[in-house]
């Protein structure tokens, strides 16, 4: 599996002053659920942006991505439509180039990414905050089995996957094993650069 981030060309220096909030974590941790709740909580905050990822997989109720075919995705790369793109789990993922304008305007941009692209994003953006959302292994396994998404592949393999990269260390970790509302409030506090514990 190849998970190498490729950044848009032509950017000089780290992009800022806004914050890039990277939400990472294992499959089944509840990242999409917490992101949806956080987005709803920030709906009237124009300084917080939740861009839709571009993915070569159909969108679903749990993951509101922009679906593209592999050919369309390749054309997007060729046209410079993405701020960053990577491949993981048999799919291609990208963040739209417009996030750079939001960050230059001082907004917080909140995105779900692979842990393997954190190092490249920390270099490209001036103010990066990594939020790891996780859950106990038995909870992860239950959630993956319950969603029964074909593209999840081998559940045991997904659960055993790790990233050995110091730059992938989280700045904040949320153990999402209780109330999704409670944990989404923690995430909102991080997004707004407030204390994240209650």
From Swiss-Prot:
Reactions catalysed: alpha-D-ribose 1,5-bisphosphate + ATP = 5-phospho-alpha-D-ribose 1-diphosphate + ADP
Enzyme Commission code: 2.7.4.23
Purpose: Catalyzes the phosphorylation of ribose 1,5-bisphosphate to 5-phospho-D-ribosyl alpha-1-diphosphate (PRPP).
Protein's name according to its UniProt entry: Ribose 1,5-bisphosphate phosphokinase PhnN
Keyword annotations from UniProtKB, A to Z: ATP-binding, Nucleotide-binding, Transferase
Domain of life per record: Bacteria
GO CC, alphabetical: cytosol
GO biological process, one term: 5-phosphoribose 1-diphosphate biosynthetic process
UniProt-listed InterPro entries: GK/Ca_channel_bsu, Guanylate_kin-like_dom, P-loop_NTPase, PhnN
SUPFAM superfamilies cross-referenced by the UniProt entry: P-loop containing nucleoside triphosphate hydrolases (SSF52540)
């Amino acid at each position: 599996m190849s998970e190498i981030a490729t950044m848009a060309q032509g950017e000089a220096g780290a992009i800022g002053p806004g914050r890039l909030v990277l939400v990472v974590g294992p499959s089944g941790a509840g990242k999409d659920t917490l992101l949806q709740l956080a987005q709803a909580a920030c709906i009237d905050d124009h300084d917080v942006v939740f861009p839709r990822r571009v993915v070569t997989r159909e969108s679903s109720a749990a993951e509101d991505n922009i679906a593209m075919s592999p050919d369309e995705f390749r054309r997007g790369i060729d046209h410079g439509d993405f701020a960053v793109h990577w491949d993981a789990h048999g799919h291609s993922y990208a963040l739209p180039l417009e996030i750079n304008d939001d960050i230059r305007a001082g907004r917080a941009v909140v995105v779900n990414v692979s842990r393997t692209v954190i190092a490249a994003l920390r270099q490209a953006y001036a103010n990066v905050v990594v939020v790891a959302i996780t859950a106990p292994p038995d909870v992860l396994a239950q959630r993956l089995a319950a969603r029964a998404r074909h593209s999840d592949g081998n559940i045991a393999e997904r659960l055993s996957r790790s990233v050995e990269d110091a730059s992938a260390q989280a700045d904040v970790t949320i153990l999402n094993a209780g109330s999704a509302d409670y944990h989404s409030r923690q995430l909102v506090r991080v997004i707004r650069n407030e204390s994240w514990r209650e």
